[in-house]
Amino acid sequence: MPPKQQLSKAAKAAAALAGGKKSKKKWSKKSMKDRAQHAVILDQEKYDRILKEVPTYRYVSVSVLVDRLKIGGSLARIALRHLEKEGIIKPISKHSKQAIYTRAAASE
């Protein structure tokens, strides 16, 4: 078997650049979603807004209150219990993970 031919440094560099290997995938930089700045303490303004707006909703749940009123989940659960106790909303389905309510005047 004849000996291998020695390549110059320039030839080796050119062979390396010629490729054959796939270039690595560049991960696209997606825009990061901003952290939600929901209220965690209920002030009078939010309380009045809950009493005014929630009875008009046909479907009321924790996630609806969090989205529309920009309050935290724990505040939304407390508000729903308070509104149910006052008779403003009535439960449709109560589950350990998700409670669903509707306005009390809808069925009357």
Swiss-Prot record:
Compositionally biased region (Basic residues): 21-30
Disulfide-bond pairs as recorded: none
GO biological process: cytoplasmic translation
Keywords assigned by UniProt, alphabetized: Cytoplasm, Methylation, Ribonucleoprotein, Ribosomal protein
Pfam families attached to this UniProt entry: Ribosomal_S25
Subcellular locations according to the entry: Cytoplasm
Annotated Low complexity bias: 1-20
Chief location category: cytoplasm
Entries under PANTHER family matching the protein: 40S RIBOSOMAL PROTEIN S25 (PTHR12850)
Protein name: Small ribosomal subunit protein eS25B
Lineage: Eukaryota, Fungi, Dikarya, Ascomycota, Saccharomycotina
